Design a protein with these regions (language model features):
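Nucleotide-activated donor-binding/catalytic signature segment of Leloir-type glycosyltransferases, i.e.
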Residues: 232, 241-269
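A short, glycine/small-residue-rich beta-strand->loop->alpha-helix junction that serves as a flexible
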Residues: 9-24, 89, 204-210
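Membrane-proximal helix-turn-helix segments that form the acceptor-binding/catalytic region
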Residues: 27, 73-80, 96, 100-104, ...
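A charged, aromatic-enriched C-terminal amphipathic alpha-helix characteristic of glycosyltransferases
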Residues: 329-336, 342-373
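Acidic anion/phosphate-binding donor-loop and adjacent secondary structure
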Residues: 165-167, 171-172, 176-194, 208
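Nucleotide-sugar-dependent
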Residues: 207, 261-270, 275-297, 307-315
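Conserved donor-binding/catalytic core segment of Leloir-type glycosyltransferases
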Residues: 7-10, 188-220, 228-229, 361
Length: 375
């Protein structure tokens, strides 16, 4: 019996149990029963045991830790040991070592482009100016050093097609919801007196958290029993301190912040307990053309969604309807928005294939067939 070819999915920025790496790409590979799968990444807060998938942690600690510079060399050692047939790199930092290793290991290299890092660095303002210049150079160097060595690109967003026009060999595989929930008939908000709002995921300034909190506090003046839960990974220590200093004692607000990524299931369970999912993203050039995974997942769970005003997102929210898109900074409109939310009949149309991972899974599985058996 011939041995299954090995596949590696690797990241520095994402934990080994990252939603896309493990539950979407990883489970889609495992389902074929054709490959020996290894997922390499950041140390998870609680690493799960997953049947027939090997989870390999090659970094832990703060992202600013200098030991992170050694990760590409650890990655190279794993490549030499495993001798994969296919390597899927999901962060730019590992590309130079992948280029080098490919010369003598002859694997197929796929770059899963989950972010437009150059745009993120320019607009998300998560680092000082001098570091942004250095980071942009390193991204450009890593992604462009030997682009011809990349056999195929995966774009996690449709907008990357126009943002990266020089890339010709690509497949768009969007980050849709890999979860299912029994369909509920159309409903209205169940609790008009003490609604439970939630913000979950990666908690950063560009997520629009501050504007959403201030919006909620204004609503809380009229609805004193309302509450807002904020749960997730807060990677910027300065922002963590700001949130805890300014809002930890605020009426109706519950903070559950971590300096490490939290398991997706933990956040999802909290979202399911809430009445309204808030997605208050700032409309930056690095964000406005993307479709947040949280939007897909919120609709899959049939949650009421309150989201930043954006024509792209509004077209999705209005379809079912799943909620409303608003200007979170328009505090004066809080009462009228709440009245509109109470009067809406949600999910008159059932969440459909536009929301779920299933179609993306088939595209990904076909891509692997094309890459490993090109004839």
């Amino acid at each position: 019996m011939s041995q299954k070819p090995s596949i590696i999915i690797a990241s520095v920025l994402k934990p080994v149990d990252d939603s896309r790496m493990l539950y979407k790409l990883g489970f889609s590979i495992r389902e074929t029963n054709k490959y020996d799968l290894n997922i390499i990444g950041f140390s998870s807060k609680k690493t799960p045991k997953v049947e027939n998938i090997r989870l390999i942690e090659i970094f832990s600690g703060p992202r600013t830790n200098l030991l992170r510079l050694l990760v590409p060399f650890k990655f190279l050692r794993k490549l030499i040991k495993i001798k994969p047939g296919v390597v899927i790199v999901t962060t730019f930092e590992l590309l130079p070592m992948a280029y080098l290793a490919k010369r003598f290991l002859s694997f197929k290299l796929i770059y899963d482009v989950q972010e437009n890092y150059l745009k993120n660095i320019s607009y998300n303002l998560t680092m000082p100016t001098y570091l942004r210049v250095l980071a942009k150079w390193f991204v450009g160097f890593s992604e462009g050093l030997d682009r011809g060595a990349i056999d195929h690109h995966i774009f996690a967003e449709k907008c990357y097609v126009s943002e990266m026009p020089d890339i010709i060999k690509y497949t768009v595989i969007e980050n849709k919801a890999a979860i299912s929930s029994p369909f509920k008939p159309s409903f209205q908000l169940p609790d008009p007196i003490s609604p439970h709002f939630i913000i979950g995921g990666t908690i950063t300034p560009v997520y629009g958290v501050i504007a959403a909190i201030e919006w909620f506090l204004k609503l809380n003046e009229a609805l004193p029993e309302a509450k807002l839960s904020i749960i997730g990974h807060c990677p910027l220590n300065s922002f963590y301190k700001q949130l805890t200093r300014d809002y930890e004692a605020a009426k109706g607000i519950q903070l559950e912040l971590s300096d490490q990524p939290l398991p997706a299931a933990q956040i999802r369970n909290k979202v399911m307990e809430a009445d309204v999912l808030m997605l208050p993203y700032q409309l930056l050039p690095s964000i406005k053309d993307k479709i947040p995974t949280k939007l897909y997942e919120g609709i899959a769970l049939q949650k009421v969604i309150l989201m930043s005003q954006n024509p792209l997102w509004k077209s999705i929210v209005d379809k079912y309807p799943a909620g409303m898109c608003i200007d979170f900074k328009a505090i004066k409109d809080v009462k009228s928005v709440w009245k509109s939310l109470l009067n809406l009949d949600y999910y008159r149309i059932q969440p459909d294939e536009d929301i779920f991972w299933e179609a993306e899974k088939r595209k990904f599985q076909q891509l692997l067939i094309n890459i490993t058996c090109p004839d």
